[in-house]
Amino acid sequence: MKYTLVYTRRAQRDIKKLESDTKDRIGKALLRFSEEPLRFAEKLSDPILGEYRFRIGDYRVIFDIEGNEIVVLRVGHRRDIYKRR
């Protein structure tokens, strides 16, 4: 079952800040992951950020699954993504 990718405003802002080659790499990975998201995802221990994460090199995508949608909550470098703001 293919899942639909939905981006929160925060995730859209996070992506906008990235360099174009990083955006491309993350976009391609998300399309690939949308086929079977739980196969590639890890459950987060702190559900305040979100339920799951994808690892894409040094970048992390924090997301929830709602029905047949992958709701992308945050996108960022691993050194920054888990910091609370």
Regions found by a protein language model. Give the residues of each.
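Enriched for short, Lys/Arg-rich terminal
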Residues: 2-13, 17-24, 56-59, 64-85
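A short, surface-exposed loop/turn module that caps and links secondary-structure elements
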Residues: 30-54
